[in-house]
């Protein structure tokens, strides 16, 4: 579901020109008392942000219309603490609302990746993480057999 809808978001502006944001897309930026959301959909007619209590909740607890910027990004700011909530974007194209998607730049997702998760990245490191040191071995001496 999310992959198909996300692919539909990557497109051209209505005049055929490709509009690309200048900086890497920060889709969900948690700041405690507010969270900023953005999705790149330059040819969408409208976009909505939907917030859910859980990854599988049927009805959003908040739906917000998003505003289109000149860079093709639709943006919305939630002015409350929504840490732990899940989100989707829904865009309208050719008069039809497409399926909801977690977006193409979600850094954290819920069950099956269908919804993005609002995370405070400052709380994700385990105790002692900053002091952790990797093995002292030359990179040329490392052999990686399988990596996913």
Give, region by region, the residue ranges found by the protein language model.
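N-terminal export leaders
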Residues: 1-2
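Hydrophobic helical h-region of N-terminal Sec-dependent signal peptides
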Residues: 5-6, 39
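C-terminal motif of bacterial Sec signal peptides marking the signal peptidase cleavage site
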Residues: 8-11
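The feature marks proteins involved in alpha-glucan
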Residues: 14-36, 68-146
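Short proline/glycine-enriched turn/loop motifs at strand-loop junctions of beta-rich domains
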Residues: 40-47, 82
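Short beta-strand elements bearing conserved aromatic residues within extracellular beta-rich modules
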Residues: 47-49, 87
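Solvent-exposed serine/threonine-rich low-complexity stretches and specific carbohydrate-binding patches
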Residues: 60-69
